């Protein structure tokens, strides 16, 4: 499908949907656009705030919607960039979606496990990512943990996506949760990188 064929150098396949246009969602959006990994017309962002949607649409020339379901139905890669406490309501937006070509779902929600994500998402590959705070200025480190349904191409897409905001390291999920409480703290990321180098 669209996901398995990586586009030309620097560009990513298909349509990108971001659910949640807050600080992290916007940081990713702005880095992806500035590095030309996606064209503005390939990105759809959902946010409940009308003001936020208007600001993102005007500033980045992208499409926005209040409907998470619209993002889910029209995107090849879906980034969940919402607060963990609203995950259950967003999970309901996935209910009953007919599985066509599998969409890749990437979650940057702290503390929401791969197994919970996989239960919410019908048969699609899931990857968790934990960008640290400097990622908002494009010089961060993102740790990713890969779900059971994700294949190599999915991992490559996630790595390419987060390379827009800095370095990417793949870790086991417990390591990801180990830094959740310290999200944004440099030492925790150094510890992860050292441990992943030791493992690998």
Region roles according to the model:
Residues 1-66, 70-73, 139-140:
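NAD(P)+-binding Rossmann beta1-loop-alpha1 motif at the extreme N-terminus of oxidoreductases
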Residues 1-3, 105-110, 115, 157-165:
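A short, flexible low-complexity segment enriched in Lys/Arg and Gly/Pro that occurs
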Residues 26, 30-34, 58, 92, ...:
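Short, well-ordered alpha-helices that flank and scaffold nucleotide-derived cofactor binding pockets
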Residues 46, 65-67, 129, 171-174:
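Conserved beta-strand termini and adjacent loop/short-helix elements that scaffold enzyme active sites
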Residues 50, 60, 68-80, 84-144:
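Rossmann-like NAD(P)(H) cofactor-binding subdomain of soluble oxidoreductases
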Residues 116-125, 141-179, 189-200:
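Internal alpha-helical scaffold of NAD(P)-dependent oxidoreductase catalytic cores
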Residues 182:
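Catalytic, metal-anchored helix/loop core of enzyme active sites in primary metabolism
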Residues 186:
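Aromatic-residue-lined binding/catalytic grooves and analogous aromatic/hydrophobic interfacial grooves
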């Amino acid at each position: 499908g669209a996901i398995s064929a990586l586009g030309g150098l620097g560009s990513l396949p298909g349509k990108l949907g971001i659910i949640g246009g807050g600080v992290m969602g916007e940081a990713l959006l702005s880095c992806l656009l500035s590095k030309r990994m996606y064209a503005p017309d390939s990105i759809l962002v959902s946010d409940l705030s009308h003001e936020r949607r208007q600001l993102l649409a005007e500033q980045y020339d992208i499409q926005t919607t209040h409907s998470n379901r619209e993002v889910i139905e029209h995107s090849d890669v879906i980034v969940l960039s919402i607060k963990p406490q609203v995950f259950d309501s967003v999970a309901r937006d996935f209910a009953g979606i007919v599985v066509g070509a599998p969409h890749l779902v990437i979650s940057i929600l702290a503390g929401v496990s791969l197994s919970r994500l996989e239960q919410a998402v019908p048969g699609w590959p899931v990857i968790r990512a934990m960008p640290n705070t400097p990622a908002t200025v494009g010089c961060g480190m993102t740790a990713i943990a890969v779900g059971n349904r994700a294949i190599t191409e999915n991992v490559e897409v996630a790595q390419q996506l987060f390379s827009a905001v800095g370095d990417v390291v793949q870790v086991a999920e417990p390591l990801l949760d180990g830094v959740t409480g310290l999200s944004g703290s440099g030492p925790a990321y150094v510890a992860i990188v050292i441990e992943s180098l030791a493992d690998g």
